[in-house]
């Protein structure tokens, strides 16, 4: 009996080990090589597969070298921000594949194919390359299928233009506090002063999302921002290990800290949501902020079709992350560009003066700022907050003339497309807001040559929110100051999930009155 039990045990162990080895070999070698062969038979060119790591090491090495030194203002920032994708585009052409570890990713530059990917939301779904990324935020931006459709329907009322009008006073208050602090600095220095505007813009946009999302001040929401920033930094440090099987389960120092920070965020958010629910029951809850509108819309759904408390908390995390990141980077690059291009700064200020004089900006006036809108679109074109969007294929399907197998990813290279001379002309790298004088649809040869906010059914639900914030901030700044680049300004855009200024944004602010 003992021999038979031992034999069975050994047999089971051998079977499990054999199965595990086969699964690992299939994942690391056989599956990628099969997909590579399939893609090459389709006529696609790309990099040869390197087991497990793919192109990650080459990409990381090139990026590390690129961000080790700043560039000149008129240099092409793609060489610094996306050096490896740029080199692959030059080497393999406008449709090619590279490797995200063992996963082939097809980069497409054709706007018609990009449009097809955006429109077929149930076929081309969100890629989930890094399991730990869910700690930053999940919510609407990461959901697919019916869950995405349900959440989009519930959240949509919060970003209706009529609702945004009610948030404009909060935008003004938050902007005024930071602009007022800059004004004091400049006044203390006799009307002219060098300021690193980046920390102030981060604080301003954090305050705006805290007040408009939760009716709370920046100080109450500050801990959430600190924790999300810490998770972002730790996540970026771990990207090189993302394709090690089960890495996100390992109790490394970084993994433990990320999960602890996420738990703390959830405790804070659960407290905010539960407090609001109790206030609603007592008839005392505000309903004009994003959380109030979200809860009201959620309660209006038929039983079983609403969101759980956990779902609401995830959407709150997303409000914080996306609401703060997108607008802060848009504002910092707008201030840098206007400091460099004094003619457009003068035009924008003159428009603000004509619409508002020295009065407080309001919703109606912000909607009349055509020059400012052109400038913001051009900044978004040249400095998109996110440089690329990945999509995943889960079953064989057609895309244009290609037949693509399950297991392949699609890469939509926002920055490369929006600086492409074939689509935007030979002056594609130049700052020319006049491109947008007739709106987005006529700015380039193809409508889907601009997708900083994505496009189609999954277009960013908060784009009007972000643009309204940015217009308010820039109107107040231009009313109060003229801007120029400081001699100490260092041009060094780099991607930390969104496109940050690596060494801040040192500008000279001149007080106008």
Swiss-Prot record:
Top-rank EC class of the record's enzyme: oxidoreductase
Gene Ontology cellular-component annotations: membrane
Gene Ontology molecular function: any one: heme binding
GO BP of this protein: saponin metabolic process
Binding-site positions, heme: 460
Transmembrane intervals: 2-22
Annotated catalysed reactions: oleanolate + reduced [NADPH--hemoprotein reductase] + O2 = hederagenin + oxidized [NADPH--hemoprotein reductase] + H2O + H(+)
Cofactor(s) the protein needs: heme
Cited SUPFAM superfamilies: Cytochrome P450
Keywords (A to Z) from UniProt: Heme, Iron, Membrane, Metal-binding, Monooxygenase, Oxidoreductase, Transmembrane, Transmembrane helix
Keyword Transmembrane listed: yes
InterPro entries: Cyt_P450, Cyt_P450_E_grp-I, Cyt_P450_sf, Cytochrome_P450_Monooxygen
Keyword Cytoplasm: no
Pfam family, one: p450
Membrane topology: Single-pass membrane protein
UniProt-listed Enzyme Commission number(s): 1.14.14.-
Location relative to the cell: Membrane
Family note: Belongs to the cytochrome P450 family.
Name of the featured protein: Cytochrome P450 72A552
Native organism: Barbarea vulgaris (Yellow rocket)
Organismal lineage: Eukaryota, Viridiplantae, Streptophyta, Embryophyta, Tracheophyta
């Amino acid at each position: 009996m003992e021999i038979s039990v031992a034999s069975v045990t050994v047999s089971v162990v051998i079977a499990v080990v054999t199965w595990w080895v086969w699964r690992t070999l299939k994942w690391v070698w056989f599956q990628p090589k099969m997909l590579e062969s399939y893609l090459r038979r389709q006529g696609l060119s790309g990099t040869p597969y390197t087991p497990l790591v793919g192109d990650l090491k080459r990409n990381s090495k090139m990026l590390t070298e690129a961000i080790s030194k700043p560039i000149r203002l008129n240099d092409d920032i793609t060489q610094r921000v996306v050096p490896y994708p740029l080199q692959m585009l030059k080497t393999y052409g406008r449709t090619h594949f590279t490797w995200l570890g063992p996963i082939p990713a097809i980069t497409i530059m054709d706007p018609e194919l990009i449009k097809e990917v955006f429109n077929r939301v149930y076929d081309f779904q969100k890629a989930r390359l890094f399991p730990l990324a869910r700690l930053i935020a999940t919510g609407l931006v990461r959901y697919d299928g019916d869950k995405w459709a349900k959440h989009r329907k519930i959240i949509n009322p919060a970003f209706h233009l009529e609702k945004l009008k009610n948030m404009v006073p909060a935008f003004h208050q938050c902007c005024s506090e930071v602009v007022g602090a800059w004004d004091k600095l400049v006044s203390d220095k006799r009307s002219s002063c060098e300021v690193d505007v980046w920390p102030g813009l981060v604080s301003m946009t954090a305050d705006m999302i805290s007040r408009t999302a939760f009716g709370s001040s920046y100080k109450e929401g500050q801990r959430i921002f600190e924790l999300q920033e810490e998770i972002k930094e730790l996540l970026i440090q771990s990207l090189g290990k993302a394709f090690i099987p089960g890495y996100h389960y390992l109790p490394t120092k970084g993994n433990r800290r990320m999960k602890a920070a996420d738990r703390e965020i959830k405790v804070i958010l659960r407290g905010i949501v539960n407090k609001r629910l109790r206030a609603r029951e007592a008839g005392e809850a505000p309903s004009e902020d994003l959380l109030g509108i979200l809860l009201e819309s959620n309660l209006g759904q038929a039983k079983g079709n609403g969101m759980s408390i956990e779902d609401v908390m995830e959407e709150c995390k997303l409000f914080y992350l996306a609401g703060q990141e997108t607008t802060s980077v848009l504002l910092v690059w707008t201030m840098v560009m206007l400091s460099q291009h004094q003619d457009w700064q003068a035009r924008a200020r003159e428009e603000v003066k004509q619409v508002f004089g020295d009065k407080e900006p309001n919703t109606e006036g912000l909607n009349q700022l055509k020059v400012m809108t052109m400038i913001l679109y051009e900044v978004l074109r040249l400095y998109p907050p996110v440089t690329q969007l990945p999509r995943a294929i889960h079953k064989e399907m057609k895309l244009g003339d290609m037949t693509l197998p399950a297991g392949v990813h699609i890469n939509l290279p926002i920055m490369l497309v929006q600086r492409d001379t074939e689509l935007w002309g030979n002056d594609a790298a130049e700052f020319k807001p006049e491109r947008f004088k007739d709106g987005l649809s006529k700015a380039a040869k193809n409508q889907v040559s601009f997708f900083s906010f994505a496009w189609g059914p999954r277009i960013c639900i908060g784009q009007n929110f972000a643009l309204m914030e940015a217009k308010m901030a820039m109107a107040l700044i231009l009313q109060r100051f003229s801007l120029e680049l400081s001699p100490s300004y260092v041009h060094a855009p780099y991607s930390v999930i969104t496109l940050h200024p690596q060494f801040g944004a040192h500008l000279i602010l001149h007080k106008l009155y």
